Design a protein with these regions (language model features):
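Conserved, structured core segments of small domains
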Residues: 1-123
Length: 123
């Protein structure tokens, strides 16, 4: 079963962190990312660009309307994603728990949401 992992952060909390705290936090991420990759189950792993460069596309009167910024009502914003191919739900949870946002970053509002995928099309 394939699972989409969404890595969330809270921009206000993250912005309140000192540069040294951010650097210390981020410096721990590569080792955890590598631990996930070493399972051989990670198909995709990505961090997302600056929120100021996000665009939202919506259908409006038969045309596609583009607006600035993320479309979200939440204080938490998706900052990264991953897709894993797990043999079971338990394995999916175990692998997702290795992600930095599941183990670090409480002060930045980090969290992971793990979602079973019904459809997956790869190149």
């Amino acid at each position: 079963m394939k699972y989409l992992g969404l890595a969330y952060f809270t921009p206000e909390k993250f912005a309140a962190m000192s540069p040294d705290d951010v650097k210390a936090l981020v410096s721990q991420c590569p080792a955890l990312d590598e631990k996930m990759r070493a399972t051989g189950k990670v198909l995709v792993s990505a961090s997302l660009g600056d929120l100021d460069s996000w665009r939202t596309l919506r259908p409006r009167s038969g045309k596609t309307h583009v607006s600035d910024g993320p479309y979200t009502e939440s204080k938490e914003v998706v900052g990264g994603l991953f897709i894993i191919d797990a043999d079971s739900h338990e394995e999916g949870l175990r692998i997702a728990a290795m992600h930095p946002a599941a183990t670090l970053g409480e002060e930045g509002g980090w969290a992971i949401e793990l979602i079973p995928m019904d459809f997956y099309l790869a190149r």
